[in-house]
């Protein structure tokens, strides 16, 4: 929203029922889905979409397990439009999006910086899907 994306174009997927309620109050024009990111493709299709332009994630990919990380990252890159981006915020200095998956989708990985305002500070990684 702060980057100029209209609130009514936001799709927010959250597993915590309490946080879903909060998001609906704070972003009343956004589509807020109570669900699991591992079911991302199902959630996106359920609202009539086939692709998305960008995904921003704060999911703790490193600690959610290798299989869940693979499922989520593949789903994101599969849903992205060509030229779209997957931004991942993490507390680890290395990109948690598996390079093998990035390469399958001919993505380009880059380090976007450190979110110093976050506590603790977080690393921001970006994968752009080949156009």
Cite the ranges covered by each PLM segment.
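Conserved SAM-binding loop
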Residues: 23-24
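Conserved SAM-binding strand-loop segment of SAM-dependent methyltransferases
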Residues: 29-43
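A short glycine-rich, Lys/Arg-flanked "PGG" loop and its adjoining helix->strand segment in the class I
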Residues: 70-82
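A short SAM/SAH-binding and catalytic strip from SAM-dependent methyltransferases
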Residues: 49-68
């Amino acid at each position: 929203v702060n980057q100029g994306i209209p609130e009514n174009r936001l799709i927010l997927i959250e597993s915590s029922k309490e946080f879903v309620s909060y998001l609906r109050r704070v972003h009343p024009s956004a589509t807020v889905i109570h669900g699991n990111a591992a079911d991302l493709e199902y959630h996106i299709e359920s609202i009539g979409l086939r692709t998305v332009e960008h995904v921003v994630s704060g999911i703790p990919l490193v600690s959610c397990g290798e299989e869940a990380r693979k499922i989520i990252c593949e789903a994101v890159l599969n849903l992205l439009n060509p030229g779209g981006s997957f931004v991942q915020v993490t507390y680890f200095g290395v990109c948690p999006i598996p390079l093998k998956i990035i390469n399958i989708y001919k993505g380009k990985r880059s380090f976007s910086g450190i979110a110093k305002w976050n506590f603790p500070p977080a690393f921001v990684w970006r994968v752009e899907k080949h156009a």
